[in-house]
């Protein structure tokens, strides 16, 4: 039973549902305590968690849609749904940051008596729950290469920092009695929220605008190609992009012009399999080109009958 539960929450949809349950529970606690304590920093936390809940709901839908197989209208699959999900989450986080800034400034102008005791207990619970949840989501995002799950992990990870700031602020209010520290802490914590929103937005924009694969992936890709250079003249026009957990790679491969179609196809298969082994979930498209005389100068093939023939003709 336990193994089944662990296996379930290790999938993209299972992790999203786990996050949904944890965040919902934290929202209920924060809303109740924010009402009792009159703390703007806890209210800001509750607002942030509510937006997390909304964005996780979007993630559940996006993950469900992104894993649907390619069809006639979507021949490249539905992976970009995860990018849209991450972008929506980013805008929600940035919007939450703006709301927190406004509320904190209003609280500085219009002072309010707060009761920090209950808030301290809730923040401790929130920090512990968010920390372990964000770690789990990061593991799942890394294993499944899910942009949407990674965005949720980033948002909840930012909650750990912001909740820690709120906790320190409430402790300071409890010790010193300086209630102005509450909105000041809220303004400090919003920096972490805005940073998480910005980073998530950048990743989502890159995916939706067909940004090239990261340098690490491109290095692996070039390494795979060079391993097959013993039978390749050269390669060029390498293009790559990503959609959700799927990678798409295109390249032009120059081969000796006397190679048969069968052998050329076999070499393409070998290279495609090598790329997929090093870069999982990759769709590889290779365009084969024949070599010409001007390719001999940079040809990587050590022994070539064509080059010998051309050399002898030029000598004659």
Regions found by a protein language model. Name each.
Residues 1-16, 73, 78-81, 196-316:
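Peripheral (non-transmembrane) domains and long loops of multi-pass membrane proteins
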Residues 1-220, 311, 315:
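Alpha-helical transmembrane cores and adjacent cytosolic helix/loop segments
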